[in-house]
Amino acid sequence: ADGCYLYSPHSTPSNLYLGEALAAMEGTETANVAASGMGAITPVLLQLCNAGDHIVSSRTIYGGTYAFLKNFTTRLGIETTFVDITKLDVVEAAITDKTKVLYCESVSNPLLEVADIKGLSTLAKKYNLKLVVDNTFSPLSISPAKLGADIVCHSLTKFINGSSDTVGGVVCGTQEFINDLRNVNDGASMLLGSTMDSLRAASILKNMRTLHIRMKQHSFNAAFLADKFQADGLKTVYPGLESHPSHQLFKKMMNKEYGFGGMLTIDVGSLEKANELMELMQHKNLGYLAVSLGFYKTLFSAPGSSTSSEIPEEEQVAMGLTDGLIRFSIGLDNNIERTYKMMKA
């Protein structure tokens, strides 16, 4: 009720309005916004796990999440097994009697592996686990909660805000779980203090109004460039290409009108070539050499030395993350054919 907002770190009207909008988008009962994506993800895992518990996680995830699970939660007695999330038999084999959480990204960063959310949900139910999905790469394109995920997280910094001027995160889930996170006595979101600033919340809510239009354009442009890059003989990874190993799976899960998303990768063979190409593109004003994504301009980076740099080199190699890999977040260019011609020139 109005008048009950006693203390801004607990709650504010702007934060609650944004949370409700995001819950409606993801099809969950409610949501809790946070100061960053990591400020959303870390309390979820700490709320679900105690000392002695175990997590099974995808091996290809955002570097910060990987570092949190690999290096930080171990201090608290929480162990994680990293697996190839695309192989359900491997995932199942990693589950122990101490496992509490299955963790993945719907489309992984940066290799764009696609998680079988329905299959993972079946496993989670079989072993009484919580399936937590980071949906940052595919808002609107994929709806994890409708496919069986228990909890859906986002970095709002990326596509949802869309203008690279704000940091934020969200946890979407049941009213009961969100209440637990917000509990003033033992709620991880409440006590760890990653409160979103109310002005940020109002700003993101404003930008959300164009998300449906933006995602369609990101997807259209990315699909066009992926086709062209592949035809040019570049090793191109994009879920919308039939050559992508999970193309059919993505097709089955997707909300068709929003396409296959705005993220693609190409492998140019070496870090030198990757840097050369990225500098050339920046020089031609075709985008920015930057590690964020979901911006209205195209962004590109070499993940091995940026967003996945927390992952040790030998593990990067094992998961197929090579030096020559360039990750693209394709922008909202009005004439993507012209952009492609300028890239080629």
Regions found by a protein language model. Give the residues of each.
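Short amphipathic alpha-helical segments
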Residues: 3, 29, 167, 200, ...
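Short, flexible turn/loop "capping" segments at secondary-structure junctions
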Residues: 162, 196, 255-258, 319-323
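Conserved PLP-enzyme active-site core in the AAT-like
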Residues: 30-237, 251
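PLP-dependent enzyme catalytic core of the Aspartate aminotransferase-like
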Residues: 70, 271-272, 279, 298-345
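Short, well-ordered beta-strand elements within core beta-sheets of diverse protein domains
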Residues: 204-213, 261-269, 327-331
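Conserved small-domain helix->loop->beta segment predominantly found in fold-type I
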Residues: 223-284, 288-296, 311-317
